[in-house]
């Protein structure tokens, strides 16, 4: 049996495609999460659909300090399957995933993309604190792994960004959609993909109003963290992530996506019916996100 570890709805979408590539193998799926809203619950069920067995693990969003560490320490008591042939995961630096793997055995390790972080220089998913306090925490929760130890075990990486250099050299491309797209296009629709880039609700609302005045999008697809709405903006309220929303409801439309630098844009960049228009924000702390655009062959549609 193989082990599939997921932390986000996008990872479930990718995981399902990977599982399709192994039709004669059984999978045990685990969905981690601190906020179990309708979207996460839906995608946990989507993971369970393609696995012979599965479980969900609540990572305790509201727990802090020692209570949080105790919850992680108790993870070993929830593990029901101990031995696996192959393990698949995206988040090498997750303490939860590292601790889970510390209490099971496996023969081979495979990874897959955690959004566009895999193709940018100095990705967060390879970062791990080296402090004494962090080492004490790992010892307390029973985590025997590190990013470096796991990275050295990677046999292959599955990527939805085959045209870009990945942090893992041995890659196998996968597609999130049916490559035989031949629907007749009937109209055009545009979206702005929400990203709360500022610290306060008021600042983010002001940014959306500014976008509305300067960018001609039809609909706004909110980020899960955006628990506010702006009058006059046409929001898409869906339990699906945007990629799935496109595949299920807009297969016969040309889609224009406006975005700052959302992973959604990179996930759909090569889709034949999708046009990506990157918007450069003037917010100082996010300028580094645009530094790699020339190397990635990306251009800015508009600056605001």
UniProtKB/Swiss-Prot annotation:
- Quick one: which pathway? Bacterial outer membrane biogenesis; lipooligosaccharide biosynthesis
Coiled-coil-forming residues are: none
The EC number on file is: 2.4.3.6
Q: Which Pfam families does the UniProt record give?
A: Glyco_transf_52 (PF07922)
| Phenotype of the disrupted gene, per the record | Disruption of this gene results in persistence of sialylated glycoforms of lipooligosaccharide but a reduction in sialyl-N-acetyllactosamine-containing glycoforms.
| Annotated keywords | Glycosyltransferase, Lipopolysaccharide biosynthesis, Transferase
* Gene Ontology molecular function: N-acetyllactosaminide alpha-2,3-sialyltransferase activity
Top EC class for this record: transferase
Please give the biological process terms from Gene Ontology that the record holds: lipopolysaccharide biosynthetic process
> Per UniProt, where does CMP-N-acetyl-beta-neuraminate bind?
221-225, 242-243, 262-263
Which reaction(s) does the protein catalyse, per the Swiss-Prot or TrEMBL entry?
a beta-D-galactosyl-(1->4)-N-acetyl-beta-D-glucosaminyl derivative + CMP-N-acetyl-beta-neuraminate = an N-acetyl-alpha-neuraminyl-(2->3)-beta-D-galactosyl-(1->4)-N-acetyl-beta-D-glucosaminyl derivative + CMP + H(+)
Where are the catalytic residues?
223 (proton donor)
Taxonomy, superkingdom: Bacteria
Q: Which family, according to UniProt?
A: Belongs to the glycosyltransferase 52 family.
| Protein role | Catalyzes the transfer of sialic acid from the substrate CMP-N-acetylneuraminate to the terminal galactose residue of the N-acetyllactosamine moiety of surface lipooligosaccharide (LOS). Thus, functions in the sialylation of LOS, which plays a role in the evasion of the host immune response.
Protein name stated in the entry: N-acetyllactosaminide alpha-2,3-sialyltransferase
What is the gene name? lsgB
